[in-house]
Amino acid sequence: MKIVVIGGTGLIGSKLIANLTAQGHEAVPAAPNTGVNTLTGEGLADVLTGASVVVDVSNSPSFEDEAVLNFFETSTGNLLAAEEKAGVGHHVALSIVGAERPPARGYFTAKIAQETLIEKSPIPYSIVHATQFFEFTRAIADEATADGKVRMAPVFYQPMAGDDVAEQVARVATGSPVNGRVEIAGPDRYRMDDFFREALTAWNDPREVVTDPNAHYFGAPLEEHSLVPLSEATLGKYHYNTWPGRLQSPK
């Protein structure tokens, strides 16, 4: 069947396209560099023609609170309207574990706004909540660095590989709509400070990881279970300590 992947040229999108194509589906990447812009609506009608499923793994180019909210509200609204006209039967969106829980965080608030639009749409849907990706480990460490030290809260942390994310999103996309949320996570649960201490040691990174209960995650405070599933989740197969990309230098 024809499955359109919004954000299909990015980290998860490209893996998802490969996964779906290997299963024999017509997987079509849709992104600004393929002529599809969900913010303006450009190219949506054409790319959605004949599509059975749409998977949205797109992301905002800006993480400033107002900009990211505008991105998800506008792009999701345009996408859902175009899907309804095209007769799409299943909308799948990738979101974040813990997005709906306090404390409120700008990016998470924007993702919940996106989910609310999806839930109110007449199109059958599935929302996949994923934990943080292995591929973002260096970026998260860099964002948490001040004065040469990486400050991390000792909260629970259960990241997963992008390949596992793509595999699970593909599974959901090729199944029946759940009209609700599905949670996915990595196979191992850590304390966040311990995870990053081990990661930086493996990189021979000289930065000290400081355990700081008041450390923020991209500007927002964390509670012990903010970043992990609270109930049953489908677990990935890749362990970080044996993941092939663990020691790769950032591009």
Predicted regions, residues:
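A conserved pocket-lining segment of Rossmann-fold NAD(P)-dependent short-chain dehydrogenase/reductase
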Residues: 125-126, 139-160, 164, 183
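Short-chain dehydrogenase/reductase
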Residues: 6, 69-73, 103-112, 155-163, ...
